[in-house]
Amino acid sequence: MAGNSIGQFFRVTTFGESHGIALGCIVDGVPPGIPLTEADLQHDLDRRRPGTSRYTTQRREPDQVKILSGVFEGVTTGTSIGLLIENTDQRSQDYGAIKDVFRPGHADYTYEQKYGQRDYRGGGRSSARETAMRVAAGAIAKKYLQQQHGVKVRGYLSQIGDVTCELKDWEQVEQNPFFCPDIDKLDALDELMRALKKEGDSIGAKVSVVAESVPVGLGEPVFDRLDADLAHALMSINAVKGVEIGDGFAVVTKRGSENRDEITPEGFQSNHAGGILGGISSGQNIVAHLALKPTSSIMVPGKTINRQGEATEMVTRGRHDPCVGIRAVPIAEAMMAIVLMDHLLRQRAQCGDVNSQVPRW
C-alpha cells in the first residue's frame, strides 16, 4: 500500500490501523542535538485524544507515545526516530454486523474495490485514528520550528455548521473543548452538539491554522510550491474536502486592486495571499483553512448495499464524533508544521548561502 509517507528532507511514514495492536511512525531528517522527550509529544496528543469531552467519540485511548529510537540522553541523534502508540480500547465487536456492508460516505466501498479486501473494524487504515501519529511527528516539527526559527504554528475551530467563531482571543482556544477563540459562541456550539446527539446526526466544520514568524523564501517552484505542499498535506487529513490558502475562494468576487497585498517601506499592507506569493513564503503569517465534512457514522438510517450488491440499510453503531472538525485542530497544526519543517530543511540545503539585500519585515 503506497502513500504512507510525506516530506523529502523531513519525512514522516505512518503505519497501523484503528483496531490493530498499535499505531506507529518513522520520522527521518530530524537534525541532531534537539532536546526531545515523550512529554514534548504528549501535549498535542492529549489535545487530539478521543474521549476527552462529551462532544467527541467516547472511545477512550490514553495515546501514550513511546520513543523507540533516534533520541539518546534527551536529545535527537540525527537518526530515524521511531514512535509507537498502543491501541487499548478497541471494540471490534461493534463492527461485526457490518463487515459485509458498505457504510455510505466512508472508504469501505473504495478500499474493497481497490484491494479486494478491507479491515472493516473501525475503518482500518482509513480511520482518523491514524492521525495520532501525524500529531506526534508534528509535535517534533513544532518544537524544531519554535526553538530553531521562532516559528509558532497554532490552529482553532472557525465554524461548526452555521455557527462561526471569530479569532478574538488565542488564549481561549485551549480553555474550551471546541478549540474556539470566541467565548461568546460556546453556548451556541454546546446547544448544537446536544441537538445533534439527540438526533443521532453529525455536522461539518471549518478549521483554521496559522504559522507566525515564517522565514521568507520557503517553497520550491513550480510543482513543490509551498501552498501546493500545504494543500496536499491538509487535504490528506480524514474528512477534509476543501483547503483555502489566505482568502481562498473569496478572491473570486474581488478586484485585483483590492486583492493584491500592497508593499510599502514599512512592509505589506494586507495578507490576502495567506503569506505565500508565487509558491514562496513572503515572511507574513501563513494562513490556511480546512473544510471538513460531517461524518457518515451516524444513527440516522441510510441506503447502501452489501458485498453481493443487494440493497440494505445502514445504521452505524459504535462510538463516533458528532463533529470530526473539533479534534482536527491539532492534526491541522501538525500537518502544517511537518510541511514547514521539510521546506526549511530544503531551503537550508539549497539556498542557505543566499543573502538578499531586499528588506524583510
Swiss-Prot record:
GO terms for cellular component: cytosol
Binding note for cofactor: Reduced FMN (FMNH(2)).
Keywords: Amino-acid biosynthesis, Aromatic amino acid biosynthesis, FAD, Flavoprotein, FMN, Lyase, NADP
Entry binding sites for NADP(+): R48, R54
This protein's pathway: Metabolic intermediate biosynthesis; chorismate biosynthesis; chorismate from D-erythrose 4-phosphate and phosphoenolpyruvate: step 7/7
Xref: Gene3D superfamilies: Chorismate synthase AroC
Biological processes per GO annotation: amino acid biosynthetic process; aromatic amino acid family biosynthetic process; chorismate biosynthetic process
The enzyme's E.C. designation: 4.2.3.5
Catalyses which reaction(s): 5-O-(1-carboxyvinyl)-3-phosphoshikimate = chorismate + phosphate
Superkingdom in the source lineage: Bacteria
GO function term, MF aspect, one: chorismate synthase activity
Cofactor: FMNH2
Residues binding FMN: R125, S126, S127, N238, A239, G278, K293, P294, T295, S296, S297, R319
Pfam families: Chorismate_synt
Function statement: This reaction introduces a second double bond into the aromatic ring system.
Similarity-based family: Belongs to the chorismate synthase family.
The protein's assembly and partners: Homotetramer.
Name recorded for this polypeptide: Chorismate synthase
Annotated organism of origin: Pectobacterium atrosepticum (strain SCRI 1043 / ATCC BAA-672)
Classification lineage: Bacteria, Pseudomonadati, Pseudomonadota, Gammaproteobacteria, Enterobacterales
Annotated gene: aroC
